[in-house]
Swiss-Prot record:
InterPro entries: Antimicrobial_frog_2 (IPR012521)
Short name of any one Pfam family annotated for the protein: Antimicrobial_2
Protein known as: Ranatuerin-2SEc
Disulfide partners: 23-28
Free-text function comment from the UniProt entry: Mast cell degranulating peptide. Causes histamine release from rat peritoneal mast cells in vitro. Has antibacterial activity against the Gram-negative bacterium E.coli K12 and Gram-positive bacterium M.luteus NCT C2665.
Organ and tissue specificity: Expressed by the skin glands.
Stretches that traverse the bilayer: none
Species, as recorded: Lithobates sevosus (Dusky gopher frog)
Keyword Disulfide bond (UniProt): yes
Keywords: Amphibian defense peptide, Antibiotic, Antimicrobial, Disulfide bond, Inflammatory response, Mast cell degranulation, Secreted
Length: 28
């Protein structure tokens, strides 16, 4: 349902942000 879609979207955004942080800290 909608909640699942929201959860999936939030997860994707969170992963993207974590990857950006990782790139800043350790390089890509």
């Amino acid at each position: 349902g909608i909640m699942d879609t929201i959860k999936d979207t939030a997860k994707t955004v969170a992963v993207g942000l974590l990857n950006k942080l990782k790139c800043k800290i350790t390089g890509c």
